Amino acid sequence: MRIAILSRNENLYSTQRLKEAGEARGHEVDIIDTLHCYMDITSSNPTVRYMGKVLPKYDAVIPRIGSSITFYGTAVVRQFEMMGTFCVNESVAISRSRDKLRSLQLLSRKGIGLPRTGFASKPDKIQDLIKNVGGAPLVIKLLEGTQGIGVVLAETNKAAESVIEAFMGLKANILVQEFIKEAGGADIRCFVVGDKVVAAMKRQAAEGEFRSNLHRGGVAQLVRLSKDERATALNAAKAMGLNLCGVDILQSNNGPVVMEVNSSPGLEGIEQATGKDVAGLIYEFIEKKAKPNANRTRGKG
């Protein structure tokens, strides 16, 4: 099969692993810089151009779209969908996952476990917003933040008020969530491919830190999922419409709760922690599912 990886940096671990794994299985794999793609959308024969040439017909596209280029990146994915190319994650699903509020609303509608959450831009009563999620300690997040950036733990109601007022001064949209103290600074990353959790790792925050992101110094280890945790991860991926994603779960007193669904999860941490060939499992999925016009939205959304 001929497969394209959309990635801005061919030297990233995940990009390199996907290329190596694909070629090891006999596929022809091209790495394409998403931002250097440009599209012909005026004709009845949609194409994607790159480096002055029309790109060839691909059997599948693996989007590795960074959050900073979501708008343009999803437009490129949508163009491939319009051409009938199978995209591992569809443009609509990627867009959903990048909108934290929309993601939580979709998960809530499906009855998937979530931390108590409030959303605000200019709340008239900050105290009521804080009270509504159970009071301090609580977590305040910028909607646009990634890798733990723009996430603050407020230990007291007064501190929470100050942080919310500061974010309001920046005209930022914020989420206010209950702090799951019983998780002990740890979360579980479930790597979903198709309808299976193919790998899972537990990430423990560094000492004195509540964010477990590996970019923040967290450490990862192999973990065995409970039946509820596995079901929660699969239901979250299904609700978002993602074939490939990382679902981050906290273990609360009320069962597993979803913190985030990542449509472009990194491979380095999960492969090193579990010893699994996750990149190869992604190609197994592609080999089974990649057919012309197999996308559900087919570029319509």
UniProtKB/Swiss-Prot annotation:
Keyword Amino-acid biosynthesis assigned: no
Domain of life assignment: Bacteria
Sites where the protein binds Mg(2+) 2: 260, 262
Residues annotated as binding Mn(2+) 1: 248, 260
GO molecular function, one term: ATP binding
Annotated ATP-grasp domain residues: 104-287
Keyword annotations of the record: ATP-binding, Ligase, Magnesium, Manganese, Metal-binding, Nucleotide-binding, Protein biosynthesis
One of the protein's GO biological processes: translation
Record family assignment: Belongs to the RimK family.
Protein name, as recorded: Probable alpha-L-glutamate ligase
Organism in which the protein naturally occurs: Shewanella loihica (strain ATCC BAA-1088 / PV-4)
